[in-house]
Amino acid sequence: MSFPYFISPEQAMRERSELARKGIARGRSVVALAYSEGVLFVAENPSRSLQKVSELYDRVGFAAVGRFNEFDNLRRGGIQFADTRGYAYDRRDVTGRQLANVYAQTLGTIFTEQAKPYEVELCVAEVAHYGETKAPELYRITYDGSIADEPHFVVMGGTTEPIIAALNESYTENASLQDAVEIAVKALSASAEGAEPRSLGPSTLEVAILDAGRPRRAFRRITGAALEALLPEQPQQADSGDKPTE
């Protein structure tokens, strides 16, 4: 008599967690950080059509890593939820904390009830309404529905340890936009110990902000010449042909 294959609930959860973590780690990293005028998103993303950063509502932004089709479904669902609530009640009733809680409940249900968890990690950010003075809010939502309120910055995807270490050393509160971009890009360029730092330019970065100084819709993408002007100068490699003759 053969017995059916049995796996304990604890083992099943461990295997699901490992699957999700590996899928998220395969992606490229995203940094979201608070600066003097709002929230800055910087994602390592060479694709111009598959975007990791987007607007959810008037004062709320979204960033994600992992499987694109999975986090894009969540993004669209969040937009629909926000639009419906804003229409039924008031636009100010739509908050980042509310959307983060909805995402946490959704991912928690998927993790426990479906055969395969979503291989995604999300960040929901919100800035104060125009004329208000409230600190930006950053929420990290993981694949199992866990939610955390981050005071300064969020790092997701790829190898996060060197990026977090770089931000712990270089992050400053109330930095200007130019300084914040430099801090984020240098942190994203950080590599594991012993490896050379990578060079990131406009063609490999997706950059956007939530600008608390904008009257209604705070979200704005930064591309082209505006992005080039904000990026730190790349070090020039020495060329033997340019050396002066002795």
UniProtKB/Swiss-Prot annotation:
Its annotated compartments are: Cytoplasm
Where mainly found? cytoplasm
Q: Species lineage, top-down? A: Bacteria, Bacillati, Actinomycetota, Actinomycetes, Mycobacteriales
The record's account of how the chain is modified after translation: Pupylated at an undetermined lysine residue by the prokaryotic ubiquitin-like protein Pup with the help of the ligase PafA, which leads to its degradation by the proteasome and thereby constitutes a negative auto-regulation.
Q: What induces it?
A: Up-regulated under nitrogen starvation (at protein level).
Q: What does this protein do?
A: Component of the proteasome core, a large protease complex with broad specificity involved in protein degradation. The M.smegmatis proteasome is able to cleave oligopeptides after hydrophobic residues, thus displaying chymotrypsin-like activity. In complex with the ATPase Mpa, degrades protein targets conjugated to a prokaryotic ubiquitin-like protein (Pup). Identified substrates of the M.smegmatis proteasome are the pupylated SodA and Ino1 proteins.
Q: What is this protein called?
A: Proteasome subunit alpha
Q: Could you give a GO molecular-function term held by this entry?
A: threonine-type endopeptidase activity
In the UniProt record, the gene name given for this protein reads prcA
Query: What's a BP term from Gene Ontology annotated to this protein?
Result: proteasomal protein catabolic process
Q: How does it assemble?
A: The 20S proteasome core is composed of 14 alpha and 14 beta subunits that assemble into four stacked heptameric rings, resulting in a barrel-shaped structure. The two inner rings, each composed of seven catalytic beta subunits, are sandwiched by two outer rings, each composed of seven alpha subunits. The catalytic chamber with the active sites is on the inside of the barrel. Has a gated structure, the ends of the cylinder being occluded by the N-termini of the alpha-subunits. Is capped by the proteasome-associated ATPase, ARC.
Read off the Pfam families from this record. Proteasome
- Coiled-coil ranges (or none): none
